[in-house]
């Protein structure tokens, strides 16, 4: 539920951050 949602958001941010690098 919430943990899964938070993990998805973190993954999205991480992907964007890696893309910015």
Curated annotation (Swiss-Prot):
Signal peptide: none annotated. Expressed by the skin glands. GO terms for biological process: defense response to bacterium; defense response to fungus; killing of cells of another organism. The modification Leucine amide is found at residue 21. It is found in: Secreted. Transmembrane segments: none annotated. Has antimicrobial activity against Gram-negative bacterium E.coli ATCC 25922 (MIC=25 uM), Gram-positive bacterium S.auerus ATCC 25923 (MIC=50 uM) and against fungus C.albicans ATCC 90028 (MIC=25 uM). Has some hemolytic activity against human erythrocytes at high concentration. This is Peptide PGLa-B2. It comes from Xenopus borealis (Kenyan clawed frog).
């Amino acid at each position: 539920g919430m943990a899964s949602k938070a993990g998805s958001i973190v993954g999205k941010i991480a992907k964007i951050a890696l893309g910015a690098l």
